[in-house]
């Protein structure tokens, strides 16, 4: 009994398959033949026989005359496996209504039982199939919101939308987040529509952007709108040539000296005098005294100033020269700033010196538009456009506004005393001189300010007629001015010329109100000019940084005084700094000719300053040593070597 019980609980013997002769042997499928075919293998070894048997069986099973499938009822869940097999009732007959029964279609799948449910209960559960509940497998359409974040600490979900585009924003972010995404086709479906997509399903469009390169120049606006995205010109990379030449010429004019001159070596605290007058003939028309203009350098601050000298002036009242103190408070962009005034005998006479700002390469309006000082006297002057003339009027009005607000009067508004310091940029000059020269003249400030307005109108008429003597015939001058310019310009000039009338109130504030529209135009032009200068300045912003890098490299490389110093050896990090210098500046082409490439130098220095992870190959001059280092390592070596250079003087061992 014991042996029988042990035999009953042993592993059951594997039963042979009844349809083994119709099953194709796996060895034939895998290896092409079965080595056990003649040694008792019971499976089929003829693939053709298997296919024919399968086709015949399919024809028999898919016959339209065959009855529909009617599953038998299983036992209840509570019955045991033995009792259920005993009481299982098999249907051996077919109902007459089976001919009209609908074909079998799966309806749904039942919910799976828990892991703790017995296997018999799971087998007895009635399956309920539903195709609609089974989701198709779509690789590109999976929901990424349920996945952990691939970046950061994993707390946030991966966004299911497309990559962020800074140039395309949604008007309603909440609506965009809740919106249903587009339905993608199933690439594994045999549908012809999905097949027509080809490879487009697997290779969707990518709209990612590269990160900002902080070691490159930042393109600050304004930007040119008439070029395409891939087009570049020289002005996009460097300072405009005309602007650069203008600045260089002004710098050269500022530093200009005149050796072997008969001018005094020093006038008070100024030295290095250079005459600025184009006409060497004495002219006392404006001030009543011959005047000369010099450029000089101050011994106090080292800056350059313009000195206007009134020859032969004798100061009789000390209060007269103190009136210049009021002009020091006038700080306006359209007025040349007055810094000081003093008398001097450095020119072997009694002279009055006025110290003002120096604007290199500046011209007067008379030299620019009235042929004053021009060697081609017979050449006719060009007509001044109305917009340029409006610009002059707004700037002079700005200057008079500042002067009159301080209780002063310009007294001199003459084309020969108005400086053109830039393109259509003018400044009133020599304003404080008449306050000293005519100090004893008794005249009210209101009358002097009205006279400024009249002189203002005469200046505009003179510039519009392109002739300095046009005011000798005012009627003819106004006829020409009326034909050449708009009615608004004509009315403004008429208003200025009639400022001396007592029956009307004429102030510079009323005049500014009348030309407010032109003031806005000039202000807009000034804003555009400011944007342009800011853009040009941004291109030169990094030049100092690159110069510092080159300076550090030259400080470190090839120092002969430390050649035998053990602490300053070029075998370590300083050695590939030396080779890096050759890599940047001493490259040659395939023919051995030097490569002069400014772009290569700028790119290398920018990457060095940023500490990029990009690696480069450095080869020694004898081609016996080779280093593969990154810009980050080179930057670290550069900083450590430079800091070591700044340490106290070391002793040579």
From Swiss-Prot:
Give coiled-coil spans as residue ranges. 517-555
**Which residue ranges does the record annotate as region Disordered?**
1-21, 45-128
Q: Where is this region: Knob domain?
A: 556-653
- Where do the segments described as Pseudokinase domain lie? 256-516
Which keywords fit this entry according to its UniProt record?
Answer: ATP-binding, Coiled coil, Cytoplasm, Metal-binding, mRNA processing, Nucleotide-binding, Zinc, Zinc-finger
Q: Which domain of life is it from?
A: Eukaryota
PROSITE patterns recorded:
PROTEIN_KINASE_DOM (PS50011), ZF_C3H1 (PS50103)
Q: Which InterPro entries match?
A: Kinase-like_dom_sf, PAN3, Pan3_PK, Prot_kinase_dom, Znf_CCCH
Give the domain section of the comments: The N-terminal zinc finger binds to poly(A) RNA.
Provide one Gene Ontology biological process annotation. Answer: nuclear-transcribed mRNA poly(A) tail shortening
Oligomer and partners: Homodimer. Forms a heterotrimer with a catalytic subunit pan2 to form the poly(A)-nuclease (PAN) deadenylation complex. Interacts (via PAM-2 motif) with poly(A)-binding protein pab1 (via PABC domain), conferring substrate specificity of the enzyme complex.
The task this protein performs is described as: Regulatory subunit of the poly(A)-nuclease (PAN) deadenylation complex, one of two cytoplasmic mRNA deadenylases involved in mRNA turnover. PAN specifically shortens poly(A) tails of RNA and the activity is stimulated by poly(A)-binding protein pab1. PAN deadenylation is followed by rapid degradation of the shortened mRNA tails by the CCR4-NOT complex. Deadenylated mRNAs are then degraded by two alternative mechanisms, namely exosome-mediated 3'-5' exonucleolytic degradation, or deadenylation-dependent mRNA decaping and subsequent 5'-3' exonucleolytic degradation by xrn1.
Q: Which family does it belong to?
A: Belongs to the protein kinase superfamily. PAN3 family.
Designated name of the protein: PAN2-PAN3 deadenylation complex subunit PAN3
Question: Where does the record place Polar residues bias?
Answer: 108-119
In residue numbers, where are the C3H1-type zinc fingers? 19-48
Quote the subcellular location field of this record.
Cytoplasm
